[in-house]
């Protein structure tokens, strides 16, 4: 199991009575007296560990292979490596990242059905054998570049109920699957299993049932062709926050019976999945600062207000946008909600408002319309559930830098991490509720002790 130490990244252990929100407020207070009120994240690594415990309870037969593309921050990958997850990598760079943290090759699946030949060769030279394919061309590339590969056939699914659809780009049909299996046999390439992905943000858990059923058909085809498959990869699409229509346990309550029906526990089939946002979405909170403000009246050009009155509306410009962390709005169909760092007065008036990013592109709009009390330059806004498909795809367009990330973890979670490293997961460990986890802010296990003010540490990613 990979190590989890201070040397890898800076993480502060929270003292009893402190929460990640306290660290966020503290950091805001620290920078508020300076001119450099840059956007930043606070990320709770303990939240990721709690998600893992929840996974073990809800999907006991399924081994998670974290989708690195979702958030490739070193601290995230290191945390997941330390608790024993596998990793879904899509490129040479992602493979280098996880193997650089000591993750063995057998805990990596190269889950990209369309790979560059040089990167297939890199995987071969570094012991990564499991990889996906969905076409004859890919089979031929692998046969030449990595003949000892253990291939996983990616099949298409009905992802019409997903927010982000993937089967339009990846996946073989059932008819094509037989042809590909026959061709793999001719090329003497080993096909060990089937993978699918129902799409990100799936709103119908029954989609998983059909996909598992289709996978069973392909397993049976493989037996007829002469393969002995033993791996099923059920992909991703699991929610990572509680603000979704479909909850995680609602999905798993449908998946588990389907797995038991088509791939019973005595079938000898290993089952894995590729969760990404599930692990990281809720761990990250982003703080942005208002850098400019504009008052707009209904009759003024550029106002979208349909209100008959001449009441003013406000445009707020903040120091992160769709070319940075909020790229999730464009590419991940995210709907974000601004929270106020300062609690408004009970009788405070609210105005129709819009929120814009810092770049010179008119497309850089974060929130088209929301109701906010009047705010001012220098005030802060918070955005929760910002861990998935945000930092990984952020650019520096117009010269705006990516936000720094400040990592924290509660003392109980830290102690559990050390126990896992030393002795593995304790028997019958159960997910602990947030309310039973006192958050602490001091260092232990050789880490420097900080004063009760609970200063946070910075890591650049």
From Swiss-Prot:
One of its GO terms (cellular component) is cytoplasm. Inhibited by antizymes (AZs) OAZ1, OAZ2 and OAZ3 in response to polyamine levels. AZs inhibit the assembly of the functional homodimer by binding to ODC monomers. Additionally, OAZ1 targets ODC monomers for ubiquitin-independent proteolytic destruction by the 26S proteasome. GO terms for molecular function: ornithine decarboxylase activity; protein homodimerization activity. Pyridoxal 5'-phosphate binds at residues 200, 237, 274-277, 389. It comes from the Eukaryota. GO terms for biological process: cell population proliferation; kidney development; positive regulation of cell population proliferation; putrescine biosynthetic process from arginine, via ornithine; regulation of protein catabolic process; response to virus. CDD domains: PLPDE_III_ODC. Keywords: Decarboxylase, Lyase, Phosphoprotein, Polyamine biosynthesis, Pyridoxal phosphate, S-nitrosylation. The modification N6-(pyridoxal phosphate)lysine is found at residue 69. InterPro entries: Ala_racemase/Decarboxylase_C (IPR009006), De-COase2_C (IPR022643), De-COase2_CS (IPR022657), De-COase2_N (IPR022644), De-COase2_pyr-phos_BS (IPR022653), Orn/DAP/Arg_de-COase (IPR000183), Orn_de-COase (IPR002433), PLP-binding_barrel (IPR029066). This is Ornithine decarboxylase. It comes from Mus musculus. The lineage of its organism: Eukaryota, Metazoa, Chordata, Craniata, Vertebrata. The gene is Odc1.
């Amino acid at each position: 199991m990979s190590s989890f130490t201070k040397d890898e990244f800076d993480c502060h252990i929270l003292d009893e009575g402190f929460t990640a929100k306290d660290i966020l407020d503290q950091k805001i207070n620290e920078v508020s007296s300076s001119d450099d009120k840059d956007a930043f994240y606070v990320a709770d690594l303990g939240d990721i560990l709690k998600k893992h415990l929840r996974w073990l309870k809800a999907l006991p037969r399924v081994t998670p292979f974290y989708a690195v593309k979702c958030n490739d921050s070193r601290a995230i990958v290191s945390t997941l490596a330390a608790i024993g997850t596998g990793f879904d990598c899509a490129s040479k760079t992602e493979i280098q990242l996880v193997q650089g943290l000591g993750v063995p090759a057998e805990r990596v699946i190269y889950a990209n059905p369309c790979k560059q030949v040089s990167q297939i060769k890199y995987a071969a030279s570094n012991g990564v054998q499991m990889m996906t394919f969905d076409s004859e061309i890919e089979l031929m590339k692998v046969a030449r570049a990595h003949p000892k590969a253990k291939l996983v056939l990616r099949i298409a699914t009905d992802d019409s109920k997903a927010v982000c659809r993937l089967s339009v780009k990846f996946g073989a049909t059932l008819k094509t699957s037989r042809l590909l299996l026959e061709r793999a046999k001719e090329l003497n390439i080993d096909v060990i299993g089937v993978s699918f992905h129902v799409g990100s943000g799936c709103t119908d858990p029954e989609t998983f049932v059909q996909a598992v059923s289709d996978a069973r058909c392909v397993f049976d085809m493989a037996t007829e062709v002469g393969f002995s498959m033993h791996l099923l990869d059920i992909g991703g699409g699991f929610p990572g926050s509680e603000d979704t229509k479909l909850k995680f346990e609602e999905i798993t309550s449908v998946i588990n019976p389907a797995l038991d029906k088509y791939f019973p526990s005595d079938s000898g089939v290993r089952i894995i999945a590729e969760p990404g946002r599930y692990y990281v979405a809720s761990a990250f909170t982003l703080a942005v600062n208002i850098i400019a403000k504009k008052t707009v009246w209904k009759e003024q050009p550029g106002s979208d207000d349909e209100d008959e009155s001449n009441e003013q509306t406000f445009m707020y410009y903040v120091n992160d946008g769709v070319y940075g962390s909020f790229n999730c709005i464009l590419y991940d169909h995210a709907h974000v909600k601004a929270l106020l760092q300062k609690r408004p007065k009970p009788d405070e008036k609210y105005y129709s408002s819009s929120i814009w990013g810092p770049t010179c592109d008119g497309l850089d709009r974060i929130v088209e319309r929301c109701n906010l009390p009047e705010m001012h330059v220098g005030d802060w806004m918070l955005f929760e559930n910002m861990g998935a498909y945000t930092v990984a795809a952020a650019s520096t367009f117009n010269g705006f830098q990516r936000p720094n990330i400040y990592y924290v973890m509660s003392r109980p979670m830290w102690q559990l991490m050390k126990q896992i490293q030393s002795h593995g997961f304790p028997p019958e460990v159960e997910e602990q509720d947030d309310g039973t986890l006192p958050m602490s802010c001091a260092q232990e296990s050789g880490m420097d002790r900080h004063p009760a003010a609970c200063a946070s540490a910075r890591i650049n990613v």
